[in-house]
Structure formats: C-alpha cells, structure tokens
Amino acid sequence: MAAGLFGLSARRLLAAAATRGLPAARVRWESSFSRTVVAPSAVAGKRPPEPTTQWQEDPEPEDENLYEKNPDSHGYDKDPVLDVWNMRLVFFFGVSIILVLGSTFVAYLPDYRMKEWSRREAERLVKYREANGLPIMESNCFDPSKIELPEDE
C-alpha cells in the first residue's frame, strides 16, 4: 500500500512540475521490495524542441585559471618566466625606487610653514637685543611715531 501511495505522489509531483514549466527529471525508479515502478506519466507533457542553433566555442576564454598551468603564478603574465620577472620588476621599483627616493624627497622638502626659520630669527633678535642693552620684547609691535591716525572731526 505504501509503495502504491509513493507511486501516486511521485506521478502527481512530476505532473505538477510539468504544468508549471519546471524541468522535470525523466526518472524511472523500481522498488526492490514491492516491485513497484515509478515512471513519469504521459500527463507530464512533452518537452519543447531544443533550439537548433549551432554551439560555438568562445574564441577568448575569460575564465582561464592561470594556477593550473603555473601554481606559483603572481598574476602578471601567463608565461611563468615573464611572470616572475614582472613580479621582480614591480617589487624592485615599488620598494627600492619609490620608498627610498620618496622618503629622501620628503626629507629634503623645504621648511613647512617656516617653523625652523621663525625659531632661528627669534633667537637672532634676542641675541642682538641683549648685546645692545635693549629690552627683549617691546609692548608696541610697531613704532608709534610712524603710525598716522585720522584726524578727529
């Protein structure tokens, strides 16, 4: 009885898949216990004819795995010898040239915002004022006799 119910439910499943347009597997199953045969019924419908277009191989395969041919590939070239040399060149120029010469360039950049110059200039003025007996700092930044004020009206 259970085998008969299984055969009936399998036929219903195949028929439902065929009516909804789902691909139904063309399976024929035979039970070894009850000798019940489950096969797709005629209700499942016929498959639509397959397209008649000719299959053509892609002239340039996009998903070629370079690691199958060269397990030590660095991703620069398909040829293993060129791949190693390209990797060496990239690392030589990337590390040696850019890091070494780049850090040398940054080290010799001019004084940023003239901090060092302003410090040296202040020290020079302090030494000059101490040597001539002048006060180190004055209350007036500008000479008051040289400032021209507008007349009061």
Curated annotation (Swiss-Prot):
Transmembrane segments: 89-109
Membrane topology designation: Single-pass membrane protein
Subcellular location as annotated: Mitochondrion inner membrane
Presequence boundaries: 1-29
Chief location: mitochondrion
GO CC annotations on file: mitochondrial inner membrane; respiratory chain complex I
Keywords associated with the record: Electron transport, Membrane, Mitochondrion, Mitochondrion inner membrane, Respiratory chain, Transit peptide, Transmembrane, Transmembrane helix, Transport
Segments of skewed composition (Basic and acidic residues): 66-77
Region span, Disordered: 40-77
Top-rank lineage group of the source organism: Eukaryota
Purpose of the protein: Accessory subunit of the mitochondrial membrane respiratory chain NADH dehydrogenase (Complex I), that is believed not to be involved in catalysis. Complex I functions in the transfer of electrons from NADH to the respiratory chain. The immediate electron acceptor for the enzyme is believed to be ubiquinone.
PANTHER family: NADH DEHYDROGENASE [UBIQUINONE] 1 BETA SUBCOMPLEX SUBUNIT 11, MITOCHONDRIAL, NADH-UBIQUINONE OXIDOREDUCTASE ESSS SUBUNIT, MITOCHONDRIAL PRECURSOR
Subunit relationships: Complex I is composed of 45 different subunits. Interacts with BCAP31.
Family per record: Belongs to the complex I NDUFB11 subunit family.
Protein name from the UniProt record: NADH dehydrogenase [ubiquinone] 1 beta subcomplex subunit 11, mitochondrial
Protein's organism: Gorilla gorilla gorilla (Western lowland gorilla)
Name of encoding gene: NDUFB11
